[in-house]
Amino acid sequence: MKWRSTTVVCVRRNDSVVMISDGQVTYGNTILKGNAKKVRKMGDGNVLAGFAGSVADAMALFDRFEAKYREWGGNLLKAAVELAKDWRTDRVLRRLEAMLLVADKKYTFIVSGTGEVIQPEDDIASIGSGSPYAIAAGKALLRHTDLSAKEIALEAIKIASEICIYTNDNFTIEEL
């Protein structure tokens, strides 16, 4: 059996940064939980972080990321790069099956176990199985509306939850 993913979306607009996720945990073809919290604030409330993938793996990565963030004096880019380097080279970490989406007031990054640290071109980023749908909806709303970051993030993940069977409509929202 395989753990299935989720959807986490981050939207930036004006001075607002919003991260939202669904709450579904799926194992094989069974929904185990519908209200999991997959986004949280860290770094004294200055960073938003969300995960897709194995919960235990993501918790380990959250802890390591927060340690790197503190080690590098609140430098989000340096913390993300250093975590990605460790993740790629450490034998134990390499086996972790998760992705992180992290953001502060200045940057948004997707961090993967293959050593990737990706800064999205637009003001929206997403990870997980519903990402393509959320990104498409979010980009359209960013381009053609004056909605707030929170409204765009919420609508983007709602649309993803209507299409992706591994994404439900029980959302957790964090905002900077």
Swiss-Prot record:
Subcellular location: Cytoplasm
Catalytic activity, reaction form: ATP-dependent cleavage of peptide bonds with broad specificity
Keywords noted in UniProt: Allosteric enzyme, Cytoplasm, Hydrolase, Metal-binding, Protease, Sodium, Stress response, Threonine protease
A single GO BP: proteolysis involved in protein catabolic process
Major site of localization recorded for this protein: cytoplasm
Enzyme kind, highest EC tier: hydrolase
Active site: T6
Record's GO cellular component terms: HslUV protease complex; proteasome core complex
Alphabetical list of InterPro entries matching this protein: ATP-dep_Prtase_HsIV_su (IPR022281), Ntn_hydrolases_N (IPR029055), Proteasome_sua/b (IPR001353), Proteasome_suB-type (IPR023333)
Record-listed E.C. numbers: 3.4.25.2
GO molecular function terms noted in the UniProt entry: metal ion binding; threonine-type endopeptidase activity
Stored Gene3D superfamilies: Glutamine Phosphoribosylpyrophosphate, subunit 1, domain 1
Keyword Electron transport: no
A Pfam family reported for this protein in Swiss-Prot or TrEMBL: Proteasome
Family statement: Belongs to the peptidase T1B family. HslV subfamily.
Function noted in UniProt: Protease subunit of a proteasome-like degradation complex believed to be a general protein degrading machinery.
Summary of subunit composition and partner proteins: A double ring-shaped homohexamer of HslV is capped on each side by a ring-shaped HslU homohexamer. The assembly of the HslU/HslV complex is dependent on binding of ATP.
Protein name: ATP-dependent protease subunit HslV
Gene: hslV
